[in-house]
Structures are given as C-alpha cells and as structure tokens.
Design a protein with these regions (language model features):
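Cytoplasmic-side transmembrane-helix entry/capping segments in multi-pass membrane proteins
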Residues: 55-61, 86-90, 111-121, 146, ...
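Short, structured motif recognition centered on aromatic/hydrophobic residues
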Residues: 59-63, 70-76, 145, 149, ...
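Structural signature of hydrophobic alpha-helical transmembrane segments
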Residues: 25-36, 81-94, 139-151
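Helix-coil boundary and interhelical linker segments in multi-pass alpha-helical membrane proteins
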Residues: 18-25, 76-82, 129-142
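The first (N-terminal) embedded transmembrane alpha-helix
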Residues: 29-42, 60-63
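Conserved small/polar residues in nucleotide/adenosyl-binding loops
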Residues: 10, 185-187
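Small-residue-rich segments of transmembrane alpha-helices in multi-pass membrane proteins
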Residues: 61-67, 118-131, 149, 174-184
Length: 187
C-alpha cells in the first residue's frame, strides 16, 4: 500500500506513491476553486434568464458548481462530502450566485467564456474525480465513472432542476468526451 499526497496530506493508496510539487498543488487548488466560482456564475446567469429570485440563484449556483463533487463523494462513501467539510466551496458557489445576480453577463465574449470555461473546468474536475476514486482503491471503470460524474454531475442536476434536458445528452458541448479522456489519463 502506497501513499498519495493530496492537498498537503498523505492519503493511503493501493499501488503507488505520488509526491506533488507544492507549486503544482497550488495551481491545481487555484484552478479547482476558480472553477467553483465560474460554475456558480454560470449557474446564476442561467437563474437570471429564468427570472429566479435570490434563493433560486443560490440553489442553481450550488447545483452547478458543487453537485458533481457531491454525487462523487456520496457514491464513494468515504467521509464527509468535500463541499461540506471545506466551507470555501460553499462560499465561492454563493459568491458566484451573487456576482451573477448583480452583474449582467451577455454577448459573444460571455458565451465563449461560458462554453470554453465549462469545458476546461469539466476536464479539471474529471481528473479530480478519477484521482479521488483511485485514492480510495476503486477499480478502473468506477474511477472513470467518478471522473465523469464529478465533471458533469453538477450541470446535469442543474438542468434537471430547471426542467431542461441535461446538456450533456446532446447539446454539442464538449464535456463528456474530455471528462472520459482526462479520467483515463489520470488513472
């Protein structure tokens, strides 16, 4: 049994030992929390288009930015859901909702940032989900599934709550294929 270093601490793993450079770990952490904020803004923007009140903004932002990780952590069933044990995730999701509530995002630049930001965040979160599954000793296919669920689960929950068909089921957004690819790369 090896040790995986994750977020500055050692975590048991089945077959290997990974040491993470502090700079890489910092960049990864910054990217992760930036993704939570961005997905909170995207969710809040979608709530604005539907005319939701502030409670709707908060819920849609939370589903968008935290739902996939929550699904992953519940399915892995090893400890507290990360978004609940690390409050900065909730703060960033709610901050994204507030930003979207008071700042109007629209136009081609926003559409571009939203589509490409979603794809980049999805890839990052796929890697996060796959690595977390590996950390807990899950087999290959469940590791890939946890990567995909982490990357796409939040947008699926958001879309279902909003009464829409989940965009990952044919909206031509590049999220599932990069999620599978990055999950495979990190296994």
């Amino acid at each position: 049994m090896g040790v995986l270093i994750a977020q500055g601490r050692a975590v048991k793993s089945n077959n290997y030992m990974v040491e993470v450079d502090p700079l890489i770990e910092s960049l990864y952490r910054w990217s992760d929390i930036s993704g939570v904020l961005l997905m909170g803004i995207i969710g809040g923007t979608m709530a604005r288009k539907r005319g939701y009140d502030i409670i709707g903004f908060f819920f849609i932002a939370m589903f968008s930015s935290l739902g996939g990780g929550m699904v992953r952590d519940v399915l892995i069933n090893r400890g507290t859901v990360a978004a609940m044990s690390q409050p900065e995730y909730l703060y960033l999701a709610f901050t994204g909702a507030l930003i979207a509530r008071f700042v109007y995002f629209k136009g081609k630049t926003w559409d571009y940032l939203q589509a490409h930001g979603d794809a980049v965040v999805s890839g990052l979160w796929a890697a996060t989900g796959a690595v977390k599954a590996i950390t807990y000793g899950l087999p290959l296919i469940p590791c890939i599934m946890m990567g995909v669920f982490t990357a796409t689960g939040g947008s699926m929950i958001r879309d279902i709550v909003m009464g829409r068909e989940p965009s990952v089921f044919g909206d031509n957004q590049p999220t599932v294929i990069p999620a599978v690819a990055l999950s495979l790369i990190h296994i």
